[in-house]
A protein has these predicted regions:
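Structured beta-strand/loop patches that form or line metal/cofactor-binding pockets in enzymes
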Residues: 3-60, 64-68
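Solvent-exposed alpha-helices and their adjacent loops that cap or buttress functional pockets
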Residues: 40-43, 146-149, 174, 201-202, ...
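Conserved, mostly hydrophobic/aromatic
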Residues: 49, 56, 83, 126, ...
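Metal- or metallocofactor-binding catalytic centers and their adjacent structured scaffolds
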Residues: 52-137
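Short coil/turn connectors at secondary-structure junctions
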Residues: 55, 140-141, 150-155, 175-177, ...
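Glycine-rich, aromatic-flanked loop segments that form ligand/cofactor-binding clefts
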Residues: 127-162
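Glycine-rich active-site/cofactor-binding loop and its immediate structural neighborhood
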Residues: 149-178, 183-187
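Catalytic core of soluble alpha/beta enzymes
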Residues: 182, 187-283
């Protein structure tokens, strides 16, 4: 029995044996290329996967692959040729026991191939699909199985480019969005000008965040964070590289009253445990 599920569902059978697994690699051109501090995204790739157990139950998962976009096909091939064969026709007690076994099995390969990120992302996608499978099989929404209570998730408009950012926010507002996230980490003056223009036009019920995408050094972040505190920001995302020592994140937290966000570039359960325990990371 997994310790991840809600106590009210402890009688649900979480065991499974996968007999089929299929990757789906997709790509859609972006009408407006998305500019980030690490490069420009000209299309939106995606890698999905479907697993089927020995009773015909199915689950869906997704593998991170947004940049560089050529990584989508690579992750699809990793799933098909490396990860899926280790999964097939074996009996697992639960998705988390399978996750632990796959992590252990491929730890050496991740080092040998120099690909800890892609391998971890593929295993994570399988984990999502397996949890989806056992939840669907039990007839329980996955968020409830894992202890969630709210089916509604607020959405925000992301990927807002530095060029014409205020006009982009206006368009997103017209489409119904009330929360917006701007890409920064370019030139400091331009970033601050965009932030000032957007925050000046925010409505009372609107939320605004910025995403640095790990662009700053610690010194650059320490110099810039106090200026950002003058604006109404819900959070500042990844001001420095995600794997920097906790002492550096703590120094940033002391330099600003704005919450700091991170997480999308953590690739192991241990990374997330450390991230959650850091008093510097609020989101």
């Amino acid at each position: 029995m997994s310790d991840l599920i809600s106590p009210q569902f402890t009688d649900i059978d979480l065991s499974f044996s996968v007999v089929s697994a299929i990757p789906f690699v997709m790509r859609v051109p972006s009408p407006v290329p998305v500019q980030t501090s690490f490069g420009t995204m000209f299309d939106r790739p995606a890698v999905f996967l479907e697993v089927t157990d020995d009773h015909g139950n199915k689950g869906l998962g997704e593998v991170w692959c947004n940049f560089p976009s050529c990584g989508a096909e690579h992750r699809g091939r990793l799933l098909e040729t490396v990860i899926f064969p280790a999964l097939m026709r074996k009996r697992f007690d639960s998705p988390d026991s399978c996750f632990a076994q796959l992590e252990k099995q491929f730890a050496r390969l991740a080092i040998q191939a120099g690909e800890p990120g892609p391998i971890a992302q593929c295993i994570a996608g399988v984990d999502v699909a397996l949890w989806d499978l056992v939840a669907r099989r039990a007839g329980v929404p996955l968020f409830r199985l894992l202890g969630g209570t709210n089916a509604d998730i607020p959405a925000y408009a992301s990927g807002i480019n530095p060029a014409n950012s205020a006009k982009t926010v206006e368009r997103c507002r017209a489409e119904g969005h009330r929360a917006f996230k701007l890409k920064i980490g370019f030139d400091r003056a331009g970033d601050l000008a965009n932030i000032a223009q957007i925050t000046a036009a925010l409505g009372r019920d609107e939320v605004f965040m910025v995403d640095v995408n790990q662009a700053w050094t610690v010194d650059e972040a320490l110099n810039t964070l106090p200026e950002l505190a003058a604006f109404s920001l819900a959070w500042i995302e990844e001001p420095i590289m995600a794997d920097r020592p906790v002492e550096e994140w703590l120094a940033l937290a002391l330099a600003t009253s704005v919450p700091l966000a991170a997480g999308e570039n953590m690739i192991s359960a241990q990374d997330f445990a450390r991230g959650i325990s850091k008093p510097a990371i609020d989101v």
